[in-house]
Amino acid sequence: MIDSIDRKIVMMLQKNARISNAQIGRELGLAPSGIHERIKKLEQRGVITGYHVCLDRQKLGLGVAAYLFVQTDDRVGSQASAHRLANIAEVQEVHQIAGEDCYLVKLSCKDNQDLGRLLREKIGAIPSIRQSRTSIVMETLKEDGALPINE
């Protein structure tokens, strides 16, 4: 667990990962060096796992987002299919899920034809995938990687 000061630091970093230690310190009434030490400890403990830039998929020519529900023939405990899926460039996320499907996979492609090629040539080439269903995103109403951290 993290204390209330670390929680505030993490909340501020989620809103703006480029915020300076000095700015965080001013807002929390702490020295920038103390903020730096706290952030380093959060990184060492694995609370902060990295710093990422948010990109506009549409402006990068990736107009189609889709979710793939996958059933595999993997043995219980084996994640061979998941690892193969995760190594495909168009795959952003792979989640092991409960229910009739094994994995939920988020994809980004240039267009529907590109999605079709991806499904046939890359995902279809994974022999342990028994069945998949694709849902194409029509409109994104919220896409935010921030976690709900309460003060």
Describe the function of each predicted region.
Residues 1-151:
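A compositional/biophysical signature of low hydrophobicity enriched in polar/charged and small residues
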